[in-house]
Every structure is written in C-alpha cells, then in structure tokens.
Design a protein with these regions (language model features):
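Outer-membrane beta-barrel "beta-signal"
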Residues: 11, 71, 75, 183-202
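Extracellular/periplasm-exposed beta-strand and loop segments of Gram-negative cell-envelope proteins
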Residues: 22, 50, 54-67, 100-111, ...
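Short glycine/proline- and aromatic-enriched beta-strand/turn motifs that initiate or cap beta-hairpins
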Residues: 1-38, 48, 194-202
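Short loop/turn motifs that connect adjacent beta-strands in outer-membrane beta-barrel proteins
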Residues: 1-8, 42, 80-88, 145-151, ...
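Transmembrane beta-strands of outer-membrane beta-barrel pores
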Residues: 16-20, 49-55, 76-78, 95-101, ...
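Glycine- and aromatic-enriched membrane insertion/assembly motifs of diderm outer-membrane
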Residues: 23-78, 83
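Membrane-embedded beta-strand positions of outer-membrane beta-barrel proteins
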Residues: 12-14, 35, 47, 72-74, ...
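Residues that define the transmembrane beta-barrel architecture of outer-membrane proteins
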Residues: 8, 27-31, 66-70, 87, ...
Length: 202
C-alpha cells in the first residue's frame, strides 16, 4: 500500500500490508494508494484508491471478483500531539464505490439425492460492469515507533448501500468492501508499517 500524506510538510508514506498479504494468500492480490490532506488542526480529507482480486470458495461454488475501488471522506484526529509529533487517534467516514467483474469459476448442483452423484460445472462464466456503493466508519491509531517509521491499526464498520449482482448468481465479494453477507454489513481490520519520506517543507 502506498500513501501520500500532506500535513505540515509535503511527505510520502509507504505502507506494506497489502503486498505482504498478497504474497501470503494466493487467493488474494491487490494494491492500494492512500492519501490525506490536513484542512485544519484536527480534520483531514482522506481517500483510498485500489485494485483487488479475490477468490471466494463456498460449499457449492468457487468465484473470483476483480476490479477497482475508490473511498473518499474525512478523518478527525482526537489526539493532541506534543511539539512536532505526528501521532493520531482518529475516527473517519468514507463513501465507497467499486466497479468490478465477477467470474463463476465452478459450481456444484445440489440434487438433494444421496444415490445420484453430484453434478459439477467447471466452465467459467464472467459478467463485467458490476458496481457497488457503501458507507464506512473507521476507527484507528497511528504511532511513530522509530524515526519516520509508523505503525497503524484501524478497524471499520461497513454498510452496503447498493450492489449489482451477476445473472443467476449472488456477489460474494466486492473490491474495497470485502465479503458480502445477507445483512449487507461487514467489518474490516487493517494494519500497516509505514515509512515517512519528507519531500519539502511548506
């Protein structure tokens, strides 16, 4: 994950969570660019732009979602820093939008008959042009653990507003939102190790 951050100076933050997760999980790959801009002492404009591919394996289906997403909103930093510290305890709100395609890789027809063998279909079927809209509440903290090295932990609660499903199949995963359940709500957790690269003072 790569982040551009503008506060008291122009700087760049590089996050390492998504590339590492892509290496450890062969069913998940993606990249995310995150930026924020301070508009007052406590308030930041924030956005995340990413691309993700995720394969979901259910009892009778295997499907892959692939696409891009944008999340935009604000962060409020409730922490009072001393001197030139840049730590944060923040709460944030995001509006999220994703455009993606979903491929039904394979599925098993459940006949409900224990005598007949199960019926499998391994012919992939892809539908493009799917979209998703959601809102997101974030809570987290960012702390400088060494000179220009930060660690961030955050959690999010997401509510799906609208999503388009493929014909004759339900979307199980939307890029940027994660897994989709019957309640159309979900939780997310993010952790990052970042390095701050200052470019120039204002």
């Amino acid at each position: 994950m790569i982040s551009i951050s503008i506060r008291n100076d122009i700087s760049c933050l590089i996050y390492f969570s998504k590339p590492i997760r892509s290496i450890l999980q062969d069913y998940n790959s993606g990249i995310e660019i995150v930026g924020d801009y301070r508009i007052s002492k406590k308030w930041y404009i924030a956005a995340e732009l990413g691309n993700e591919e995720f394969t979901t394996n259910e009892d009778f289906t295997n499907s892959t979602s692939k696409g891009s997403y944008l999340k935009a909103g604000v962060n409020y930093n409730s922490y009072n820093n001393w001197l030139d510290m840049n730590n944060e305890i923040f709460i944030g709100f995001r509006y999220g939008f994703a455009t993606f395609e979903q491929t039904l890789n394979s599925y098993q027809i459940n006949t409900g008959n224990t005598i007949l063998p199960p019926v499998f279909n391994n012919s992939p079927s892809t539908q493009k042009g799917l979209t998703a809209h959601w809102s997101e509440l974030q809570l987290g903290f960012r702390a400088e653990v060494y000179n220009n090295i930060f660690i961030t932990f955050s959690g999010s609660y997401k509510v799906m507003v609208n999503i388009s499903d493929p014909r004759n199949f339900k979307t199980h995963y939307a890029p940027g939102f994660n897994r989709i359940y019957n309640s159309n709500t979900g939780f997310g957790f993010n952790y990052t190790i970042s390095y701050l690269i200052p470019f120039a003072k204002k």
